[in-house]
């Protein structure tokens, strides 16, 4: 009996391990499961794929470029994130099993994933596919299609519709419902072909069409051999998406892309009435602007995604794909005439982006329902495009923003107020600064006064030590080479005034980090930048570069910290040296010896005499320098490496406990990060903080609530913020 019980416990433990596989980077650590809740505004990031379920009218699936996978059971009014088991969060395509509602497939930039429990857990399906790479994407999936009449057979096309940089000329086939795969193409598609879409005829599982960067290709032998099928299409052959009519297999539609600056407009929708052999233009009513010479593809007009009514081959929907041509367009006569079907007035809190359509789905269970995703929003109609609703956040009349589970945003920083319990400043990519004053239950976007050219991102926030209403923040565009500004608020962050006038000595550069000391009226500000450490001793009225005398070049300063009067700066390595930490009481001096060979510094945290510095792997000047975490207990007099990892990110010390985030870049097959690790013994041992409520391990920002040290805030690269409750 005891042996049987032991085996049951072991089996249960193994089931949990399989259901929630840990990243390789933390498999050697003990796991501490804690409760988590999500905080976010809803929307705000790229919606890359969307699909109405064929099995349940109210079920809607959404896939995003950094946020993974979401399910709504009430037609988009609320969502659940379901990312456990995914090792890549860019979901290009979603496929639902024709007869089993619990089986789904995700095509990501890093490969194929399958669930048998409707997304509660995912397993990677790699058998037969190329080996996993740590340096590149080996198989970027653009589309799945099931073979009609055989739900165990499905195809996976390889391509990258968004970047148009996924050319491999590959289509893979599985005959055991995705468990194993084989390359099916024998001829006709070369390695320079980027497959954007794939379709199969409803009445013939052997007949297929592929839309590619080099035109349409047709196969009549289940994908083994291919031939061009472009009769009637423009000569540029920039085909994009396909829609094969389920009710009339002779009817197929395809969209073509316009390239900015070409003299003649040659995009639009084309229709075939012979199964894709010949094509006729069907663009009457669609705007036809070629754009100015030298302009990019977003400054002309073209449509991209397609959906055809399963009952009527003449009822079709398409989505505007450029900045100048947004929203959804419909036809009821096979494309003879198109009309805009989406209103100019957009509901929801995201007003500063247009509804450029990135994905589109017509419900097979109820064709009066249409859903589309944009670079930040989801919209649906349930009455055939008569009325529309936003489906990414709650509709409020009090100016507050409350998400509904579809959080698709990335964080630069999480900054708790030192003065007001429950107030946090959240610095986002793309949407700027959002603030909560009720512990994350609602948010407000606080960007009034920030110049438009700096409004993309908020990188950092710092409150005055003695005044809760006085706040500074760093705004700007991505990247070290970007432009930026420091702005000041005297009303708790509601409005801002840039500290960047020409007479101030302001140095236009990216603002990586910011710290404030002193008291009214002469606050002491420092900000970290690629052009050095920039200082103001008069609250931002004037600025000057700080001389770090020991550093042989103009330092690229990456992080700042202070505890009391002492300042610390994490600095990128100069020629021949690794990263370094500097400290200042009365003068700056280097604290880390060159022998440490620290990689690219990401963060510095301090509490009393304890200093924690994190870094990622770096290869520079023909020398590899490792990432990890280094720790000092004596104000920088001595150091030891307490954790090794290729990409350590944010660092926090709270009540003597250490926290480090493990992140990653998104340019290889497995790139979900490693979550958060925690040490209670000065880095001698570490535990991995996990739990089913944490749906994103790509932790980019950390903070502990100063009013409640058991509350850990984790900003992520894709799913906004998670708040964990420490034991």
Where are the regions a protein language model picked out?
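Sec-dependent signal peptide recognition
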Residues: 3-11
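Extracellular glycan-interacting surfaces
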Residues: 2, 18-727
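Hydrophobic h-region of N-terminal signal peptides that target proteins for export
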Residues: 10-19
